[in-house]
Regions:
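Active-site gating loops and adjacent loop-to-helix segments of metal-dependent hydrolytic enzymes
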Residues: 97-118, 176-191, 225-233, 290-323, ...
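Histidine-rich, glycine-flanked metal-binding segment
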Residues: 27-32, 41, 46-86
Length: 431
């Protein structure tokens, strides 16, 4: 049995109901039809909360949206007073196989935690993510857990465990010698957090990952070559361009980890679809990205979390990394580059994914724009906008109700009271 699938089986048993329990039940079916009646509807597209709108769901899809809908005899009415109904939120940058670094360091997670333990945690984290109203995630690398994300995705899709829809990157790709863990005796072969490849071998590695189930290819365009060093570029433009061509030919998008201006420039010119982090991005780099249609996933929450783990309490004076990140985010906003929402969740707790949304608004992005980015915007960037990210007829019924009005008070996204995925209600907080 494949090592990753074996670990997934062990993990599912560990978090299941135990020896002698009843056989697993089939995945729940959506209700025949339901009319959802919130106070208002944020459809993900126009940035407004439409008061008095209702949403009719039939099976797994949305049938109608508007103010004058009534329930026929065969339609269940779901009353959600005091709430705003939104599309299921999308986190475009998670690592379900990581957990917060103030619990266990990244090195120790990669080197010391057994795969079955990491998979069991990932199962729990997937459920927490869904319960928080995030019905889709893009998982950008298992960080040493191989292809276990493919198995977790299958378990969710088959209804074995609850969780969001997943787009997975499996192992991700790094230049030889550039990634971690680092700082060990060179005589020891240390497991790596991603797959190493260079030159023509890089395309072969990308194709292998796609063949094993990757929905997206992730490259590290820059990283710290030595422990404690600043990030520097890794791959050449030509290396990354070859991967982009291979991935796009296979119908996959490419995400690039890049924090330095040069790493971001190379990745953009290579044709990647999104750049993750962009910590030191400049006005010139963001203009280049906009011209090439490259999106930025700023991952504000990860940087915020790391500084808090180091002792910062959120007050002034801010650490230098936060000051620099604020400046780059302001430049990105001013440039008009497409922004996706993804917190690098896993650096901080799964289930608190909305932390990124709240920070983006707190750092100057209009709440309505952040909400659109977290729904229809993310769906478009990830290539799933034909079926997810908006409340409109024909779309999949991935829906979340939050207490209050998130356009007026962005913190409302943290007050999730009702969640449906594909027309199946998976969370309902008593009113």
């Amino acid at each position: 049995m494949n090592r990753n699938w074996a670990a997934l089986v062990v993990a599912l048993v560990a978090v299941g109901s135990g020896i002698g329990a009843a056989p697993a039940q089939p995945a729940p079916e959506p209700a025949a039809a339901m009319l959802i009646v919130p106070d208002g509807v944020f459809d993900g597209r126009d940035g407004q909360v439409h008061r008095g709108w209702r949403v009719l769901v039939r099976g797994s899809r949305i049938e109608a949206v508007g103010p004058d809908l009534t329930a026929a005899a065969d339609v269940q009415t779901v009353a959600l007073p005091g709430t705003t109904l939104m599309p299921g939120m999308i986190d475009a940058h998670v690592h379900l196989f990581l957990h917060p670094y103030n619990e266990t360091s990244w090195n120790d997670q990669v080197l010391k935690e057994p795969l079955a333990l990491r998979t069991a945690r990932a199962v729990v984290s997937a459920r927490a993510t869904l319960m928080a109203g995030f019905t889709t995630v893009r998982d950008l690398g298992t960080e040493g857990a191989g292809d276990a994300d493919v198995g977790l995705k299958a378990a969710i899709d088959q209804g074995i465990v609850p969780g969001p829809r997943m787009l997975v990157a499996t192992r991700a790709l790094v230049a030889s010698g550039s990634y971690g863990p680092k700082g060990f005796d060179p005589g020891f072969v240390v497991p790596q957090g991603a797959e190493e490849a260079d030159g023509t071998d890089l395309v072969a590695a990308a194709r292998r990952q796609i063949g094993r189930g990757a929905d997206v290819v992730k490259l590290y365009a820059d990283y710290r070559w030595g422990a404690g060093e600043p990030s520097r570029p890794t791959f050449s433009i030509e290396e990354m361009r070859a991967v982009v061509e291979a991935a796009h030919s296979a119908g996959r998008k490419v995400a690039a980890h890049a924090s330095t201006p040069e790493g971001m420039r190379r990745a953009t010119l290579a044709g990647v679809d999104s750049i993750e982090h962009g910590n030191d991005g400049t006005a010139e780099i963001f203009a280049l990205m906009k011209a090439h249609g490259t999106a930025l996933c700023p991952t504000l929450a990860a940087g915020d979390a790391i500084e808090r783990y180091r002792g910062w309490n959120g007050d002034k004076p801010e650490p230098g990394s936060i000051i620099a990140k604020r400046a780059s985010f302001a430049a990105a906003l001013k440039s008009g580059v497409a922004l996706c929402v993804g917190g690098d969740t896993g650096v901080f707790s799964h289930g608190t994914n909305a932390r990124e949304i709240v920070l983006m608004a707190g750092w100057g992005m209009k709440p309505a724009d952040v909400l659109r980015a977290a729904t229809a915007g993310n769906a478009a960037i990830l290539g799933i906008g034909d079926r997810l990210g908006a409340i409109a007829p024909g779309m999949l019924a991935d829906l979340v109700a939050v207490r209050g009005d998130p356009v007026a008070d962005i913190a409302a996204v943290e007050a999730v009271v009702w969640v449906a995925k594909g027309g199946v209600v998976v969370r309902q907080v008593p009113q």
